[in-house]
């Protein structure tokens, strides 16, 4: 009996230890941000970019906006769920004058297939947290792009964009930046030439278009 209890206890310790040792999704990305901030104090009154890979892969974003000070803390593959989970880590170290968000596309395309209302709910939660941290900062949301590889999700993306647009338009010191039409051909179809082979991430030409649309909104 004693041996059984001993073995059971050791098994419990092993399982518990294994579970607690597992890292949360994107843990390493957050630690990387902390390392960057420790090496160099983040500037005050900058523009804080948060979100998923469309921002993450914009590594030379400062070259597109040379007269702006931008802190890019986006991490590829992230969902609004992850922004909410890591909100303290993403917001506490900074004192921005503006927060620009691109996120939600991965929520919609996730295997759990959340509804437009659920994705919108996640955004509102993050917006509320950002506003609580930065009462006077401008908050801007860049609309979800209609990536060719995710055409099956376009209807939900359009619903989410509409909901967030109406929400942001009703808020003070908030912006909805719609990049969707600027990425279309004259006939209204998506310009696939703006995308890499994966038809998900953009080429530099896509970012040039984003720059033209976004610039008037940046503080």
Label the predicted regions:
Residues 14, 146-219:
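Catalytic His-Asp segment of secreted/periplasmic serine-dependent ester chemistry enzymes
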Residues 73, 142, 177-179:
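Conserved beta-strand termini and adjacent loop/short-helix elements that scaffold enzyme active sites
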């Amino acid at each position: 009996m004693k041996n059984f209890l001993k073995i059971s206890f050791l098994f419990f310790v092993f399982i518990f230890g294994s579970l607690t040792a597992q890292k949360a999704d994107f843990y390493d990305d957050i630690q990387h941000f902390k390392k960057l901030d420790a090496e160099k104090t983040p500037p005050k009154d900058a523009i804080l970019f948060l979100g998923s890979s469309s921002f993450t892969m914009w590594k030379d974003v400062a070259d597109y906006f040379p007269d702006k000070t931008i802190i890019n803390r986006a991490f590829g593959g992230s969902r609004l769920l992850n922004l909410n989970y890591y909100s303290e880590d993403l917001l506490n170290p900074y004192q921005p004058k503006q927060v620009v968000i691109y996120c939600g596309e991965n929520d919609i395309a996730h295997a759990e297939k959340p509804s437009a209302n659920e994705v919108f709910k996640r955004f509102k939660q993050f917006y509320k947290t950002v506003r609580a941290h930065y009462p006077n900062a401008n908050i801007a949301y860049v609309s979800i792009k209609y990536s060719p590889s995710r055409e099956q999700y376009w209807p939900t993306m359009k619903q989410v964009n509409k909901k967030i647009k109406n929400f942001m338009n009703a808020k003070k010191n908030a912006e909805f930046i719609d990049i969707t039409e600027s990425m279309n051909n004259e006939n209204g179809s998506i310009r696939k030439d703006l995308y890499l082979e994966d038809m998900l991430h953009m080429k530099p030409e896509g970012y040039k278009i984003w720059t033209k649309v976004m610039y008037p909104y940046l503080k």
